[in-house]
């Protein structure tokens, strides 16, 4: 377990009232939620092998993600209240349970803190060889959008995991359309891998910026012109050494300059 003791758990949940004599510690109440949250982290964000090799500072991000996710899951099942001093547990008649609205607000705050930590950790993990070869690393490496910041670019108040999951299929669809019809699958795959490996060059970064900008505009339902897509092709053509895969791709054939040859056998032959 990433979070092993009640003391460690309480480091991430401020201002929790002390348990009364005979009451189970908060850790015991949340243990099943902590296990689910850690499993979710290992599948979606950071596997256990990668976590074990992280620095203490980066492990703190993973721990915060687990606690905030577990707390979000647990709140409806716990006797928690939100007091002027922070979170509390209803352990005697001196504490009044929080309203439904305040509990909802508390859950929203846990998700906000979780997602901020997810975004920070994902950005840190790029270039980590263990993570790159892991299940979550390979999953993130399939898309040109490899963090949660796109949700903020599309109008959300902060990076949002739920927003990202709600739009990932649309993002992947746009990415595939751009790859097949304009930048080529080979170039798109290479850009995704460069992002994952944290080896993006300045020239690659400019093309990634163009692709990301088009995707953001499409998600925001802003008008995107074909000129934006043509600019990507022209940019690739201007940098053939960097994007050498493009010239031999099926996509490049779509942009070849064909010359019509007037043959005598043709019915429309003219001199």
Tell where the protein language model's regions lie, with residue ranges.
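Catalytic-loop motifs flanking and including active-site residues across diverse enzymes
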Residues: 66
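Conserved short "hinge" loops at termini or chain/domain junctions
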Residues: 1-63, 77-271
């Amino acid at each position: 377990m990433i979070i092993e003791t009640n003391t460690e758990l309480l480091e991430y949940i401020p201002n929790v009232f002390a348990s009364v004599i005979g009451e189970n510690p908060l850790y015991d109440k949340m243990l099943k939620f902590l296990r689910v949250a850690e499993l979710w982290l290992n599948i979606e964000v950071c596997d256990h092998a990668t976590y074990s090799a992280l620095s203490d500072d980066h492990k703190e991000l993973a721990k915060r993600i687990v606690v905030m996710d577990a707390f979000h899951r647990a709140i409806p099942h716990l006797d928690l209240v939100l007091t002027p001093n922070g979170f509390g547990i209803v352990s005697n008649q001196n504490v009044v349970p929080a309203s439904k609205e305040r509990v909802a607000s508390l859950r929203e705050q846990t998700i906000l803190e979780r997602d901020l930590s997810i975004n920070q950790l994902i950005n840190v993990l790029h270039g980590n060889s263990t993570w790159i070869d892991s299940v979550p690393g390979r999953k993130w490496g399939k898309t040109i959008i490899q963090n949660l910041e796109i949700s903020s670019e599309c109008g959300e108040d902060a990076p949002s995991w739920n927003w990202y999951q709600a739009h990932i299929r649309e993002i992947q669809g746009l990415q595939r359309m751009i790859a097949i019809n304009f930048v080529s699958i080979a170039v798109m795959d290479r850009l995704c891998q460069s992002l994952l490996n944290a080896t993006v060059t300045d020239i690659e970064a400019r093309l990634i910026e163009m692709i990301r900008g088009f995707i953001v505009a499409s998600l925001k339902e802003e008008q995107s012109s074909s000129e934006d897509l043509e600019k990507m092709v022209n940019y690739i053509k201007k940098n053939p050494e960097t994007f050498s895969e493009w010239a031999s791709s099926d996509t490049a054939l779509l942009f070849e300059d064909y010359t019509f040859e007037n043959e005598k056998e043709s019915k429309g032959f003219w001199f």
